[in-house]
């Protein structure tokens, strides 16, 4: 049985062919999870006939119920003529204190001030977040005289799965190999696993960490077109993506409305992703935002207005790089493209993971999945539920990190390890080799942050961290290196990853002594000949994705 058939058998009614959303989306400005919510109702099968029939039904639903802004007046007329009509639209709710009622605004239909029942708001507090929630709404029209508001909300259902059986999901893990499970997650996020190596899959999975870990501080910078913001925009109704130009302290954290405090996005969403996180000409970042952000990233709380507020939302920063990695390592640093106001140690030290977006290939036609993956609102609900499962303590069974690491270093590594474990091994069953793969990845992604801090803020040089650990299963000391560190000759000012042992030092001394008499030697006839160095037999290991290696560099001297 192939892995795709395993998926269909294990998750009956919870899978969908991932290219179907593209077939129905067209130019609609609708997240994938909205479309797959509909596809999951009609196309959750591998039977071509059922899929084709379901596709037509979904297309009919979109045609008849999705509100295009250009057709808003026609839809209003339809509602008036028929008395009611079901629509798909993005709904935002505010409290009208004067009337003592909640009122809804419809993004595409163009209606505002529509009364909405308190029960809907209590069950779906994200309606109040100011960012809007995609919903299926039956909206009615009230005829007659002396009617203050003609429109009424008869039914409202947010487009997301209502409940899941988390234990059933975890139980199915045993039916898949690790490679099959990772590939299932790749298909689920809409990508073709056949176009990626294992490291690229890990980097892609890391984008899910903010969804599965509370208060996870994530950053990814890389070239354009590599899918950095895709997961945060399309995957989950529990996350929100905001453009860099629209980010304010009031919108993110809390705003004052008279004497009343209105919570911002972090109070309602699992993930708040800051897109286009890069320096923009002529635009300065509010100092209050930076201070509030730093406090939140460190303490999971923020002080605005009268009190202190706590939240569990993960913060994500994604943006484009301006130069190649070798250029940045040699001339600047790997944070060079972010807003200048954020290039300071106090902020960057709070980042748990720096994902190397430059290692992901630009997305092309064959990069997208045409296979079966879990329906996005189902996996989003699973990840949401897994946020309550803390696996950080498991790390201590495998590794003891050097005492030179700061508490923030330890916390970052623990949280990344915990999140990756929940994603790949939700049942907790993994081999030692698999566990140390997670340890190394987690430590590398934190070391990437720390290496750049030495360049940006020299005060970190006073107590440099040695990124190494004792493997508690073997007792062997292991060094941690970033891939760009081994691929490029331009290192951070402080690096303990390649400490030479006594044998290598002795070999170097011997080699130095061999060459101390000059570059040339004379034969018995007095003819000058170039000295041939004494070469040592050795073996070399290269990491997946490592660059800077050539045949000439390896073998020319031999």
What are these regions, as identified by a protein language model?
Residues 171, 175, 197-201, 369-372, ...:
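Conserved phosphate/pyrophosphate-binding and hydrolysis machinery centered on Walker-type P-loop NTPases
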Residues 234, 377-380, 443-450:
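Eukaryote-specific, cytoplasm-facing alpha-helical/coiled-coil scaffolding segments in long proteins
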Residues 194, 217-220, 360, 388-392, ...:
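Intrinsically disordered or highly flexible coil/loop and linker segments, enriched in small
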Residues 526-557:
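Short amphipathic alpha-helical interface segments
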Residues 1-188:
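Extended, charged/polar low-complexity intrinsically disordered regions
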Residues 399-515, 520, 524, 544:
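C-terminal alpha-helical "lid" subdomain
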Residues 307-315, 320-428:
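Phosphate-sensing "switch" segment of ASCE/P-loop ATPases
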Residues 192-327, 331-334, 349, 470-496:
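Conserved ASCE/P-loop NTPase catalytic core
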